[in-house]
Amino acid sequence: MKKITLIGSELAKTGNEFIYLGPLEECEPCRFKRICHNNLDVGTRYKIVSVRSANHPCTVHENGVKVVEVMPAEFTIIIESKKALEGVTLTHVDVHCDRVCCENYLSCHPEGISGKYRVSSILPEKVECKKGNSLKKISIVPVQQ
């Protein structure tokens, strides 16, 4: 489902993705606060699907903000193989691993997942785990609560 929000004019490009982290102190007195923040869920990754041309003033973004339409972004993560079933809805749990230098660490511990998601596809590429975990790379879409 598409949502309307505001984002910095320099960042407002169709296809860009961002993780919403919540309002800043500087946002409190702003007349655009509700449209900027009330439609988004903290910790969720969004993709910009359209950008409107009007520019609005903002104390946080140097060149102002633009109105954009966003939707939760589909993205790729790594999970335990036994949970990787296409179409299933899961609540995310990071893969148990403390090897922060591993090439897969960020995919096993992704940012921008809050709540539940649906496994949209299981990717065919093999995932090597130095700890011996059986892992799969999947594409997911957040489920609206």
UniProtKB/Swiss-Prot annotation:
It comes from the Archaea. Belongs to the UPF0179 family. This is UPF0179 protein MmarC7_0952.
